Amino acid sequence: KSLMEYWLFKSEPSTWSWEDQVKKGKEGEGWDGVRNYQANNNMKKMKVGDLGFFYHSVKEKQIVGIVRVIGEHRPDPTDKKGIFGMVVIEAVKEVNKYVNLSDIKSNENLSELALIKQARLSVVPVSKAHWQEICLMAETENKF
């Protein structure tokens, strides 16, 4: 069995918010609408059980929750060309303290984080060390 991987999912709260995700419960929600090849390739690597940070983009720019992958890569029904896919994620818990982008950028332990390095991508990998560091910043125990 491969080790768990960690990810970060960016969403515009006006389009799909943490509250929307939480309302879906155990059924989860397909992470559709991704139209970037690299973000799509990142989703292709995801396995059921992988964890991710849920990040509100645009004005907020902060990590607000933790999600789990419950469905692996499959066709995205919103992509009429059939090029891009999606995974299914469920909300696990809200973080105890929101972690904003400025705090992430000012933490030297996170200088290599893909969120900073590949700022345009909506789905990015997070290393285990970065995951643990952000959990500390979020005052959220890394047990899910």
In which residue ranges do the predicted regions lie?
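Compositionally biased, charged N-terminal/linker segments
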Residues: 2-46, 141-144
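Short beta-strand-centered aromatic/proline hotspots
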Residues: 62-72
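Short, conserved beta-strand edge motifs with alternating hydrophobic and charged residues
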Residues: 8-10, 54-55, 66
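Contiguous surface segments at macromolecular interaction interfaces
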Residues: 3-16, 76-144
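Short, charged beta-turn/beta-strand-edge "cap" motif at the junction between a beta-strand
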Residues: 55-61
